[in-house]
Amino acid sequence: MMDWYAIQTYSGSEQSVKKAIENLANDHNIRDRIQEIIVPTEDIIEVSKKSKTKVTERSLYPGYVFIKVDLDTVLWHKIQSLPRVSRFIGENKKPTPLSEADIGHILEKMNNRAAPKPKIFFEQGEVVRVVEGPFANFTATVEEYDVEHRKLKLNVSIFGRNTPIEILHSQVEKII
């Protein structure tokens, strides 16, 4: 019977584990027992210091691969022994199938991919430090964040007065 299982992997190795499982299925002629292997991802926007943007993929569930498989003990041990596989998720060291609700939520999240999100997000009222431009080294409060144009409207305190400024989000850093 085909069920969904979660496999814990080394973080960042999800795609290589997926490929290793596909190779295992092809090499051992068991492709009919493995119906689907997924690594849910989302698109994010990364901005370099020179304000160049690129869209990259990031795993929604770092360190996990989901597999729909007709699992028996032999296949379980073969998959478990693949490089970068930590374990199947389950109780008492035995794999436990995911519930329909859990896998439904994962698949829905994967299928409802929105527009790429910025890697760094600023919230209204957040305090940031300006790192470039005439207001470098000033602290400011975020009033508005325009994700599409990657601009921030900030309030900077200059000589005791709040002064509104608008700058690119690459010109500020979060204060931790």
From Swiss-Prot:
InterPro entries in UniProt: KOW, NGN, NGN-like_dom, NGN_dom_sf, NusG-like, Rib_uL2_dom2, Transcrpt_antiterm_NusG, Transcrpt_antiterm_NusG_bac_CS
SMART domains recorded: KOW, NGN
Keyword Transport among UniProt keywords: no
Keywords of this entry: Transcription, Transcription antitermination, Transcription regulation, Transcription termination
Residue ranges of every copy of the KOW domain listed in the record: 125-149
GO cellular component terms listed in the entry, alphabetical order: cytosol
Pfam families linked to this entry: NusG
A Gene Ontology BP annotation from the UniProt entry: regulation of DNA-templated transcription elongation
Tagged with keyword Transcription: yes
Role, per record: Participates in transcription elongation, termination and antitermination.
Family classification: Belongs to the NusG family.
Protein name as catalogued: Transcription termination/antitermination protein NusG
Gene field: nusG
